[in-house]
């Protein structure tokens, strides 16, 4: 089926259900960022493979919303279809809610799968439709169309595993007790744990159910006297089932969550996070007494304990060795005049990571973007879209690994030949932004909103900006994007020691260039004085930053010192694990810069 045929099939299904339109989001029952293939309907229907998008189909038009990371990619992937691409957040572009209000009339109905839409968003759409006398109905008409083609992936059924306290620093019982303490503070007695990363953190549960994210499709239900894991039968070994039982955890089938909620006593008080709860489950929870608030697990898992931090540091040493060896391979291949494509870059990098102990998969699909392709922040080479690396300009490589001791995310932008003056200027500004974020010292009440400006200052000075956050939290053997902390203009979360964050400013000029430099950082205690409690960042990523493009005279003394100190630290941490040739290469790349 073509994209337009799939859209037509949605119209027929909506009409047969007595409705006038269909909405599909990139979401699942767990409000996940990366979806199990079984739930990832939007790319199949639209042809757009980016994240955080919404498709609306009415009887006479269709539109898809994407954020600033994907404008260029969406325009390309939707070309030739009837779907109108909506650049969310751009001037003059309506929000999804505004569009629904404009395109639905009195008595008309919009269908969506309530189990795959966050409650807060479903309620927003209900309100928008109500303004015109229209309504929303929770009904999944997309799945039968997809199922009938035989192209829909099955739900995962492989064996899960439990991480050990030596990896995580805590048992399931320890973490259940932490959650119960937070429920008491909130005046609640029960929590429906829906996020796969939250279930994974709570019970030390891991699997291979999502691409690049080692989590299991499951729910958990915590009350003051019980904890239940809802997961497909047969997915845990007898030994792991017994380990969970020792922590007071019982097992039920994955589909039984809503029935279990309905069966609880009427006086059970649920702490409900509308943003993290699908609409179908939300309706079941609100049949009980509720207290509105964030799922406490988000904040708890955002602060890594000492065992996790020790493992994360080891993880970055291993990853640093792999990436340094890749850098050597890349430099050698280019010097020999070998023709490399963007997909070749991904293959070379995966090969080096696979040599590392404890590595088991990438933490996201590698972005290897040559030249103007890098202006698309989340570009992916595939099929015919796979540029050859030419001997000029930049190659941007953004990737990461999943290890048995942590999760990594790193971006480097490599010069692969002569550069223009503009490319050198842009690179230097991005480096300055990266450094200013990394060397920030701040009081312990600062939020991601406040800290974001540390990085934007150097690019803003030249009236340049990037349409995304500066950084995101990173999970522990979990999702590479993890909250609640982030570095972005609208994040109110206060930073605390033990949080990890990426530092990844960039410049993206369509049809010209894309540059990003990314390290992971650990938020650390910097001491107290009469002015308060101070925090800062320590680098976790241990990979040299290309210095050839840098306009050294534009760096401040503090910025230059930071760069030289960082490279000295990289050499100190990695050299014991390298052979003599590798040490010599790394020493050259980490040599201090001077004016």
Task: List the model feature ranges, each with a label.
Residues 1-595:
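Active-site neighborhoods and metal-handling regions in enzymes and metal-associated proteins
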